[in-house]
Amino acid sequence: MAFRKEELSQTLYENESEQSSETKELMLNNEESLSDWRNYFDEKLTIPGESGALNGTINGYLTLPQPDGCLLVLQHGAGSSAMSFAPVTQELLSNSDNKVGFLALDLRAHGETTLEPESDMSLETLSKDFTHAVSYVQRMFELDEKIILVGHSLGGAICAYCAFQKTIPNTSGLVVIDVVEGTAMEALGFMKTYLSNRPTSFKSIDDAISWHIKTLVTRNRLSACITVPSLLVQQEDGTFVWRTDLYKTSPYWMDWFKGLSDKFLRAPYGRMLIVAGTDRLDKTLTIGQMQGKYQLEILPETGHFVHEDVPAKISSLLLNFWHRNQPLVLPPKVGATPVLQ
C-alpha cells in the first residue's frame, strides 16, 4: 500500500536526526512503497526518441502546473535517476498552492530510459535528449508556462548548456545544484578510485540503502528509501547491480564540465547556484558572485546530493527563486489618457 501524499508532505522532509520515532517507524514499515513514483508525480511518460521510438524512449514523470504557474524541469546527475528529485516534489506542490508543476527525466543509460546507443554520453547528445523531451512535453500538453531548468551535478551541466544555447522556449531561470567547473574537473581524478571502492552488487535493496547512508552518499534515510531502488536492477540470482555503468562514461567526464562556469554565467536568465560549501566555488564563479551575477545559496549541513539531504530547504529556495523571477506587471498610470487607434 502506497503512502498517502498528505502523509508524505508531513513527514518526508526533515533530516533523519529531526524525525520523530513515529515518523521513523512509519518509514521503516513502508520502505517498499516509498519508491513508488505515484507518491510524487501525477503521470509517467514514455517519450519517443528524437528519431522516433525505434532508437528507444525517454522515461519521465510529470505533474502539470496551473495556468499561472511555472514548470520546473528537473534533471538528475550521473549514476542517479529522475526519482532523485522525488523527495522535493511534494513539498513544492503543497507550498505553491499547486501552481508549480514539475517534469523529471531519466538520462540516457539511466533509470527506465532506453535510448540507444547508451554508449553515447557526450554533453551535446545528452542536451539534445533533454531539449527534445522538454519540447515534446510542451507540445503534447500545450504548455506555455514559464520554465525553470533545475539540474544536479551532470544534470546541472546539461541545464546550463541548454540555457546558454537557448534551446528550450519559455525558459526563465536556471538552477544548478552542487556542480562547479573547477572543483568538478579536480574531482575527476579521484572518480575511478571511488568507483573501484564501491560495491558492484547488493544482496537486497535494503543493503543498498544502508550502504548509501553509511557512506554518507545520502544523509537522509527517508530520501534514500525513495531514490535508491531506481538506481539498481535485479539479476537472475536475486542480487542487485547498478543500472548505470559509470566506468563506461569516463571518456566523457571532461566534456561534461569543461566551460560550465562560463555557460552558467552567460545564460540569459535568472541564475541560482546551490552548493554544499564555499570550497565548491572556482575562481570564475567566485568573481561572478562578487559581481552579483547570480544568487548563491550554501547549505553546509549537506553532502553532494543536496536535494536529497534537505528537500524542504531546496523546495523553499526554488519557490522563492520562481517568485523573484516572475515578470513584473506594472499597473497603468493613474489618469493616463488611453491611446485611440
From Swiss-Prot:
GO annotation (BP), single: cellular detoxification
GO molecular function: protein C-terminal methylesterase activity
Region described as Disordered: 1-24
Keywords (A to Z) from UniProt: Hydrolase, Serine esterase
Active site: S153, D178, H304
GO cellular component entries: cytosol; nucleus
Domain of life the protein comes from: Eukaryota
Presence of the UniProt keyword Hydrolase in the record: yes
InterPro entries: AB_hydrolase_1 (IPR000073), AB_hydrolase_fold (IPR029058), PPase_methylesterase_euk (IPR016812)
Ranges of Polar residues composition bias in the record: 9-20
Reaction equations catalysed: [phosphatase 2A protein]-C-terminal L-leucine methyl ester + H2O = [phosphatase 2A protein]-C-terminal L-leucine + methanol + H(+)
Signal peptide: none
Name this polypeptide is given: Protein phosphatase methylesterase 1
Organism: Schizosaccharomyces pombe (strain 972 / ATCC 24843)
Lineage start: Eukaryota, Fungi, Dikarya, Ascomycota, Taphrinomycotina
Gene from which this protein is expressed: ppe1
